[in-house]
Swiss-Prot record:
This is Protein CYSTEINE-RICH TRANSMEMBRANE MODULE 12. Mostly expressed in roots, flowers and siliques and, to a lower extent, in stems and leaves. Signal peptide: none annotated. Belongs to the CYSTM1 family. The lineage of its organism: Eukaryota, Viridiplantae, Streptophyta, Embryophyta, Tracheophyta.
Amino acid sequence: MQDMRDQNPPQGYPAAEQVSEQPGQDKKKKKPRFFETKQKGDRGFIEGCLFALCCCWICEMCF
């Protein structure tokens, strides 16, 4: 069996060296964000409680 590095991609597909992140996106042209997203563990106590209450309320309505 051939090694995966020795195989060429099917015709019409670019080689791995030629592929960028995504077509039309450049690292220099990214728009700045107006807000910072929080990491999963950075949510506050009140936000967690409200989320739990909403989930309980939705479960009560569905079941």
